Amino acid sequence: MVAGRPILRKPDDRRLQVAVSQVSGARSGTDRSVPLDLGFLSLSSPMPYTPIVATLGYVLSPDRSEVLMIHRNARPDDQHLGKYNGLGGKMEPGEDIAACMRREILEEAGITCESMSLRGTLNWPGFGKQGEDWLGFIFLIDRYAGMPLQANAEGTLEWVALQRLMTLPMWEGDRHFLPLVFDDDPRPFHGVMPYKDGRMQSWSFSRL
């Protein structure tokens, strides 16, 4: 800092520089090229990762022997057509992730969450129909109020025995993380599962 003014550091050679032509006078017709530092537009800066943020919830029956699943069989153009999945959807502006989960369960199943816990987070690069990235917050709902709907606009709702869950048609990646949702380890898991052309490419996770 010199006399209250910041010291401007010279950009390195990796910074983007462009030449701007200036006319030195209307009558002279001569040009002078002046280097313009646009270091703040450095080409080496990566684009920010902006996945779609969503929730995915699994509702347990009162005796904890069954889980409420949606069979996506209503829309022919559904990316999930024919598969079983938990309930959930995209987070909306103005709500936190827990509020998003409660809203989605109410909208999709007609019940109110009374007790739930965050079981994990999952980063799904490339999972979307057009290759969009998704970031999911996965909840287990162990107490609710109301009577679940039998169906919604996406498909039918079915109580499935936990022992039979892995026999259902589902995304191949779900078979890897679902055991972590229902096991006895109290620690949430945090995983990454890249997809390409609808197929899981890899899977890793940690627990804290």
Segments from the language model and where they lie:
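Unchanged
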Residues: 91-114, 124-180, 202-208
